[in-house]
Amino acid sequence: MYVAALFFLIPLVALGFAAANFAAVVRKPEGTERMKEISSYIRSGADSFLAHETKAIFKVAIVIAILLMIFTTWQTGVAFLLGAVMSASAGIVGMKMATRANVRVAEAARTTKKIGPALKVAYQGGSVMGLSVGGFALLGLVLVYLIFGKWMGQVDNLNIYTNWLGINFVPFAMTVSGYALGCSIIAMFDRVGGGVYTKAADMAADLVGKTELNLPEDDPRNPATIADNVGDNVGDVAGLGADLLESFVGAIVSSIILASYMFPIYVQKIGENLVHQVPKETIQALISYPIFFALVGLGCSMLGILYVIVKKPSDNPQRELNISLWTSALLTVVLTAFLTYFYLKDLQGLDVVGFRFGAISPWFSAIIGIFSGILIGFWAEYYTSYRYKPTQFLSKSSIEGTGMVISNGLSLGMKSVFPPTLTLVLGILFADYFAGLYGVAIAALGMLSFVATSVSVDSYGPIADNAGGISEMCELDPEVRKITDHLDAVGNTTAAIGKGFAIGSAIFAALSLFASYMFSQISPSDIGKPPSLVLLLNMLDARVIAGALLGAAITYYFSGYLISAVTKAAMKMVDEIRRQAREIPGLLEGKAKPDYNRCIEITSDNALKQMGYPAFIAILTPLVTGFLLGAEFVGGVLIGTVLSGAMLAILTANSGGAWDNAKKYLEAGNLEGYGKGSEPHKALVIGDTVGDPLKDTVGPSLDILIKIMSVVSVIAVSIFKHVHLF
């Protein structure tokens, strides 16, 4: 009873904290009438897109839920819908906050002319998204655990279940897989839809506004300016929040699935009797342990967030954000050590599942995950921040022309793949050394255990960026834009760590889900056989090799589709901007207003049209290949997708980020003799335009592709293991 109360209490407190912060921000003044007008344009555009997107998503979600109920269990379908609702709720709440906080940040900067008060409003607004991600994710998972796991007895019955179609699975593993899939589907739609929206508007605004019309960033004469600012909220707040919520849930669920299948797999046949090598009590503790771990992390995140909100405003935003993030991380590390030891210390059979140092073993794996995430974040910052040589060199190469910018940007991205990959390799090996495959899953959870703070920091950046756009469009004092730009720059630096955690956790979780895929193939006839014979994928099997090739190819086709989706929408926007510049008298002189709504309609319509196909690729690839060629082929597909997708995600994120910051390096006055409007600047604007869909659409979506394909495969493997054409 007390445990159940604790389970509910922490997510509810987090959501209550988010509601309090929402109310506190909304009470702050919005500024001048012009500021209110611009803010209302951004807010209505974002709300309209999100409403249409949500309707489209839930039509698909209901169909998937019905299919899950038919082919697996009704509990899986219900859990899927719950995951979709929780993920969508976090995105809606976070974006509504962001579109209300932006103008209030600009007003705080305008009235005080200080960084501290503006930082406080921006971070308090961002914390609503962060707390919503942690709160809604864990509230849904706790409901699944308590209702289906405890009340309906799925955690007590860990034997293989055979449903009416003859499909074999462990019921609770199937149910939590449904919850994870619900979160993943929302993340895919939000990331793709938001990514197409924001980058199409961004590309069009840059291509015409900066290079043809010589208009500065966020100039009110540019018809795409409002759409660009709407896109920041749709893609960088709602999309990012759904992405990290899905990663967070995926890390927890992969741990639960692995633990659930340990009971039927670790069985020894002695004579005619089957003896479980790992007691049921141990398995049940390993199932609930990752949920407790995540709850502790959420509690620590609230303390880290509270530090910035209650403290006296500071003019050093980098220090404040770092203290918030590392306070959350340090508290999580310390408190989870106590949790791990006292929760697992009396359990038997831990050595059988790979715990090398007894009860404390998974905590070591979690620490490996945290340090791996920090290191991957450092590499992301090293290759993309203009404080370091790679991006400085890229910026200087613009003097030689656009071709050199593109070539050097690609070279930088390719070279940047190696250090984080080596970090991942070592992290996986050490996590596995401490606690086996379960430890690898816990390492992913360790990276994201303080996700509420990470998302708060990441969401603060787009809010500050929007505030800068509003100040520019309202022609406020240049000092206001200077303050918001400083806040945005700090957010971009800190967000590099967040991207490292997102990419790293995706790979760790994908490996755990792949192990879950192998575990999920077990049938009642396999019980008692050595695990090494049951969990076998023959790399010399032609089906496995062929599947790996197809899986690798899928990631490139998927990426190509996303880039073309962005560019098609951007081309329509470019035509519209040119039309308005040509046909609206006095527009470029500032004597007439552009038709902002027409640009919003174009980007919104195209984003909504393009977001469904990538999700169907992710869902149908394992299903179609599985029913055609069987479980071994799908195992190969997953290997190819993970390996190729991980490398491509790092490459696109870092090339795109470097092109963006190389442009900012010149704009900051670091290339003597060359400023805005010069030929090197135009070359860097083109490089930034090329990188836009790579870093903010392709890279993040690849992470989700990997996890959706893995979860769908885990759910369906027991079907196409026995039912396939060839």
Swiss-Prot record:
GO terms for molecular function: calcium ion binding; diphosphate hydrolysis-driven proton transmembrane transporter activity; inorganic diphosphate phosphatase activity; magnesium ion binding; potassium ion binding; protein homodimerization activity; sodium ion transmembrane transporter activity. The keyword Lipid biosynthesis does not apply. The record marks A495 as: Determinant of potassium dependence. The keyword Transport applies. InterPro entries: PPase-energised_H-pump. GO terms for biological process: sodium ion transmembrane transport. Inhibited by GdCl3. Requires K(+) for maximal activity. K(+) greatly stimulates Na(+) binding. Thermostability depends on the binding of Mg(2+). Substrate binds at K199, K695. The record marks R191, D236, D243, D696, K707 as: Important for ion transport. Mg(2+) 2 binds at N229, D232, D465. Its cofactor is Mg(2+). Its EC number is 7.2.3.1. Residues 1, 72-73, 154-168, 262-284, 344-358, 431-436, 521-541, 630, 723-726 are periplasmic. It catalyses: Na(+)(in) + diphosphate + H2O = Na(+)(out) + 2 phosphate + H(+). It is a multi-pass membrane protein. Ca(2+) binds at D660, D688, D692. PANTHER family: K(+)-INSENSITIVE PYROPHOSPHATE-ENERGIZED PROTON PUMP. Belongs to the H(+)-translocating pyrophosphatase (TC 3.A.10) family. K(+)-stimulated subfamily. This is K(+)-stimulated pyrophosphate-energized sodium pump. It comes from Thermotoga maritima (strain ATCC 43589 / DSM 3109 / JCM 10099 / NBRC 100826 / MSB8). The lineage of its organism: Bacteria, Thermotogati, Thermotogota, Thermotogae, Thermotogales.
